[in-house]
Amino acid sequence: MRASILLFTFLFIAHAALAGDGKQYGKELTVKEVTKISDILAKPEIYNGKRILVEGNIVDVCKERGCWIKIASDKDFESLVFKVDDGVITFPLDAKGKKAHGEGVLSVKTFTKEQLIESGKKHAEKEKQEFDPASIKGPKTVIQLKGEGAVID
Amino acid sequence: MIKWRKWNNILHRDIGYTITMLTLVYGISGIAVNHTADWNPNYQLQKESFSLEPVKGTATPEMKQNVMSQLNLKDEPKSVFRPDPETIQLFYQGRTYTVDIPTGKGIIEHVRPRSVLFEFNQLHLNTPKKAWTWFADAYAASLIIVAITGLFVLKGKNGITGRGAFFSIVGVVIPAVYWIWYQYL
């Protein structure tokens, strides 16, 4: 009986400590001005390597480790991946649909067809999925924000 | 008779009692998060498919209303997203509706935190940061004290000079051999 009371008290305190909105993840935000995701995606080379702040609704979260979120652009059919190093920040899976402000350094990298096939094979092997190298049609530019801090409403 | 063993055993016993709960938390969570490739240790994910009439409307707000009406959803979603011209997503707390606009076929994804394990994992992985970092440091220091004092609880043939020496060496050899194999072989 006493053990049960202790366990429930512990869980209640832990839950209360972990609950709440407007949560800070990682470092505090320092950039004041928001850059529109649509502007970044339109001319990524301008922002490559720069520290920026973006805002938008979270439309996807890394299911395995919570190590990235996808933030919707201010325009339809666009989004930006906000990627953090594994373990540094763990985003909750139920953050989908919430509004986020994320700060980090923009990374723009172009991968060759061969690099994409190699990486696709490794990913498929890890995920135990099938991979068709023919699905890779050519080089691809990956734009993501190397995230350092975020606030989720 | 020197009194260091008495104080050693008192420290081992009382710190041991104090950290029992946290050791269970870290141990259970440790097993859970070791296997993230096989499951999500924090959340239960469930997907259900459904079928609607093709979604009507030309702009996103109209399409959202049409989907809500077809699914009989009364509450406004937290947000709506169009990942591509043929898909609309409605986000509610703990569930996401993804609908293929031309066919009306869709999927509901339910996300629920796993009871108990969610809290255990958050504490183990120090998600709260701030004060919990200090608690976690104190816990780690306590574990070190319990481990060292544990070596000297017993004396005689079951102590560190007898049986204890054998098992302590086994505890050193296992990680050392594994690391050499992992790093160099």
Region spans (language model):
Chain A
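Sec-dependent N-terminal signal peptides
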Residues: 4-13
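OB-fold and OB-like single-stranded nucleic-acid-recognition modules
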Residues: 19-153
